[in-house]
């Protein structure tokens, strides 16, 4: 009793109440599933270790000094007498029965725990598989979309290449058609120069028109095919961009799956053909760059050819206009020479009329005719020897003293009137100068036919001015030389004798035609004077008409010169356009080269990153 009292409550307690796993077993209901699995696993491990230890002791047939227990505690039994039979067999059975029950209990507990863990693991595995399958389906869908985009980009690139080849062939056909047009044009021009019949010219012209029509159709087809090639090239570029976007989506999905499912996700899912796809996309982009570069080269060649042909045509037109300009200038010069010759002929006729009138007026008309003849001969000699016409110098004071002030006064009045009406100052001055010259000429003609007194006044001024200039001219070296030349010419040619003989002949002719009285001679002289006046007016009119014709021809020549300058400007403009096309071609190539360089750098960086990751993985 004393021992029981001394032991207290611990001595009377059940062995299971003091078991080391009691607290752990009582806490099973409050633990988390993971801690629950850890506790049961630890208990199972301890149980199996102890069972293996007991089994090894029994197999070694070692006598048990005391009752072996699983918890290493001695078995308590009631005291008995010394002579009483041992109760080893029954105790052994009870011990065996307790160990078996504990083993059974732990086995059932382990089976329950294992079943629960397996169910949870299965559920997690199902969830994992479903998530993995969803990610795999998403990756498969993106991969299929990427492959479709790559195939479409490749097909579009092939179509663009075929369209570019067709456009090139059409360009060659258009070039051949242009050559045929040039040949037909040359045949037609040669036929026109050779003066072939009209039916032959019509057939050649029809062939030329047909060749032009075929060339136009060929250029239309070439332009259409070039536009189609450009359109397909743009479509290929868009599809290549779409394929690049699909590849980026695949890369993003793979990176997201790797971050979500861990580094082992790549081991559980099949490897995506990303590298081959990237390489294929790079090949497609390279082919696309080749097509774009080829298209730029062809475009530059076509523009260069077009500009060259346009320059050649403009140069041909320029040469033609230049020839026409030279012809118009030559025609104007010939017209001026012709009108000058006509004026000289009429002047000599007027001189002859003056000589004819001398037969009926006596010495005065003859002297006047001789003076006119001397002045005409002297003017021609002076023009031939010195290149200067003294008659022009004699008429210069008339222009400066009479005609020029009159023209300036009329021009000033007309200019002021136009400015008062609101016309621009510069345009008014130009119109006033033109109208002033016209009005002055009209006024002189009207005065010549109507106002005899005014004509006499003007004539007196003209005679005074001419007399003064003639005096100065005779006093100068040119005048003295002219007098000497006239004297020598008179001596050598017998002009004096010719004059006397002419006077005698005129007297005889006057007697032969029956002009004896002075009045009859004056009447004929007046008639001859009227005829000379009419011829002089006709000469002036013909000279004015010739001047107008020459002015028209010169205006045509100036128009041709303007066309020549315009053609030269067009040629310069074509050169500038060709230079701009070359600059645009260089810029396109630079952008494409920069794009491919960036792609190459990105691929190189990706390869370097892969090598670094592989090297680190091997090191681990």
From Swiss-Prot:
Region entry Disordered: which residue ranges?
A: 58-95
Coiled-coil regions listed: 309-339
Task: Tell me if S-adenosyl-L-methionine is a UniProt keyword of this record.
Answer: no
Question: Main localisation, per the record?
Answer: secreted
Using the record, list the residue span of the signal peptide; answer none if the entry has no such feature: none
Q: Does the keyword Transmembrane apply?
A: yes
Question: What family classification does the UniProt entry report for this protein?
Answer: Belongs to the SctE/SipB/YopB family.
Q: Under what name is this protein listed?
A: Translocator protein BipB
The record lists the organism as Burkholderia pseudomallei (strain 1106a)
Query: Which gene codes for it?
Result: bipB
């Amino acid at each position: 009793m004393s021992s029981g009292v001394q032991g207290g409550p611990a001595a009377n307690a059940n062995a299971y109440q003091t078991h080391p796993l009691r607290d752990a077993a009582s806490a099973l209901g409050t633990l988390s599933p993971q801690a629950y699995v850890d506790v049961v696993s630890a208990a199972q491990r301890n149980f199996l270790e102890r069972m293996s230890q007991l089994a090894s002791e029994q197999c070694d047939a070692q006598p048990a000094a005391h009752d072996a227990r699983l918890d290493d505690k001695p078995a308590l039994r009631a005291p008995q007498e010394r002579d009483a039979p041992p109760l080893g067999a029954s105790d052994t059975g009870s011990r065996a029965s307790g160990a078996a029950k504990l083993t059974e209990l732990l086995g059932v507990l382990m089976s329950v725990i294992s079943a629960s863990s397996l169910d949870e693991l299965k559920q997690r595995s199902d969830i994992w598989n479903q998530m993995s399958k969803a990610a795999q389906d998403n990756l498969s869908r993106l991969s299929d979309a990427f492959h479709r985009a790559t195939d479409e980009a490749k097909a579009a690139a092939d179509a663009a290449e075929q369209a570019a080849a067709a456009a090139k062939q059409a360009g060659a056909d258009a070039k051949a058609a242009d050559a045929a047009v040039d040949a037909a044009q040359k045949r037609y021009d040669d036929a026109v120069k050779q003066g072939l019949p009209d039916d032959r010219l019509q057939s050649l012209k029809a062939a030329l028109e047909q060749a032009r029509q075929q060339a136009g159709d060929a250029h239309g087809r070439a332009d259409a095919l070039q536009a189609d090639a450009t359109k397909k090239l743009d479509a290929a570029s868009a599809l290549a961009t779409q394929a690049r976007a699909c590849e980026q989506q695949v890369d993003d999905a793979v990176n997201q799956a790797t971050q979500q499912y861990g580094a082992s996700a790549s081991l559980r899912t099949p490897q995506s053909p990303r590298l081959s796809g990237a390489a294929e996309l790079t090949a497609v982009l390279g082919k696309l760059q080749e097509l774009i570069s080829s298209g730029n080269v062809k475009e530059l060649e076509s523009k260069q050819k077009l500009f060259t042909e346009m320059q050649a045509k403009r140069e041909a037109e320029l040469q033609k206009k230049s020839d026409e300009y030279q012809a118009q200038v030559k025609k104007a010069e010939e017209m001026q020479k012709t009108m000058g010759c006509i004026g000289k002929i009429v002047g000599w006729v007027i001189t002859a009329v003056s000589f004819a009138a001398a037969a009926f007026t006596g010495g005065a008309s003859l002297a006047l005719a001789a003076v006119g003849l001397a002045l005409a001969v002297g003017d021609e000699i002076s023009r031939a020897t010195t290149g200067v016409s003294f008659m022009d110098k004699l008429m210069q004071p008339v222009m400066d003293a009479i005609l020029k002030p009159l023209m300036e006064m009329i021009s000033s009045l007309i200019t002021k009137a136009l400015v008062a009406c609101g016309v621009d100052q510069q345009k008014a001055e130009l119109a006033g100068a033109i109208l002033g010259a016209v009005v002055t000429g009209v006024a002189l003609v009207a005065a010549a036919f109507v106002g005899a007194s005014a004509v006499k006044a003007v004539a007196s001024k003209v005679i005074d001015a001419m007399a003064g200039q003639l005096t100065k001219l005779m006093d100068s070296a040119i005048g003295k030389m002219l007098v000497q030349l006239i004297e020598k010419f008179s001596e050598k040619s017998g002009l004096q004798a010719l004059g006397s003989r002419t006077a005698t002949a005129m007297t005889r002719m006057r007697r032969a035609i029956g002009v004896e009285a002075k009045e009859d001679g004056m009447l004929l002289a007046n008639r001859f004077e009227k005829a000379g006046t009419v011829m002089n007016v006709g000469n002036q009119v013909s000279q004015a008409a010739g001047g107008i014709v020459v002015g028209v021809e010169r205006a045509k020549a100036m128009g041709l010169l303007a066309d020549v300058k315009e053609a030269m400007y067009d040629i310069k403009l074509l050169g500038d356009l060709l230079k701009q096309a070359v600059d645009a071609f260089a810029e396109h190539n630079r952008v494409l080269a920069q794009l491919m360089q960036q792609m190459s750098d990105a691929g190189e960086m990706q390869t370097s990153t892969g090598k670094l990751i592989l090297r680190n993985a091997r090191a681990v």
